[in-house]
Curated annotation (Swiss-Prot):
The keyword rRNA-binding applies. InterPro entries: bL21-like (IPR028909), bL21-like_sf (IPR036164), Ribosomal_bL21 (IPR001787), Ribosomal_bL21_CS (IPR018258). It holds the Pfam family Ribosomal_L21p. SUPFAM superfamilies: L21p-like. This protein binds to 23S rRNA in the presence of protein L20. PANTHER family: 50S RIBOSOMAL PROTEIN L21, LARGE RIBOSOMAL SUBUNIT PROTEIN BL21M. It comes from the Bacteria. PROSITE patterns: RIBOSOMAL_L21. GO terms for cellular component: cytoplasm; ribonucleoprotein complex; ribosome. Part of the 50S ribosomal subunit. Contacts protein L20. This is Large ribosomal subunit protein bL21. Belongs to the bacterial ribosomal protein bL21 family. The gene is rplU. Keywords: Ribonucleoprotein, Ribosomal protein, RNA-binding, rRNA-binding.
Length: 103
C-alpha cells in the first residue's frame, strides 16, 4: 500500500514505515502529525484518486528530526570588473516517519 500526498508545495509518494524529508514543520520532535491533503491511495489493484483530494484519506506520521540541508552557494561575478559576491543558503527540513495510511 502506498499513497501520494502534498506538503510544503511538493508531492511525496510514501508507504508505511518509510521516512520522508519534508519542508520544515513547526511541530516538536516525537509528536504525531496528520496529513489530510492525500492525492492518491493505492492498495494492490485498488486505486483511489482524489479530485483534488481523496475523501477521508489521512496519512499519520511521527516527527523524527529537524535539521538543515547541505549548503548551496550563490555566486555573482562580473568579469574584468573586480566584482565578486558570494552567499550561502541552508534550507530547514523535517524528517517524518509514516505510521499509517487510511482512506
Amino acid at each position: 500500500m502506498y499513497a501520494v500526498f502534498q506538503s510544503g508545495g511538493k508531492q511525496h509518494r510514501v508507504s508505511e514505515g518509510q521516512t520522508v524529508r519534508l519542508e520544515k514543520l513547526d511541530i516538536a520532535t516525537g509528536e504525531a502529525v496528520e496529513f489530510a491533503e492525500v492525492l492518491m491511495i493505492a492498495n494492490g489493484e485498488e486505486v483511489k484518486i482524489g479530485v483534488p483530494f481523496v475523501d477521508g484519506g489521512v496519512i499519520k506520521a511521527e516527527v523524527v528530526a529537524h535539521g538543515r540541508g547541505e549548503k548551496v552557494k550563490i555566486v555573482k561575478f562580473r568579469r574584468r570588473k573586480h566584482y565578486r559576491k558570494q552567499q550561502g543558503h541552508r534550507q530547514w527540513f523535517t524528517d517524518v516517519k509514516i505510521t499509517g495510511i487510511s482512506a
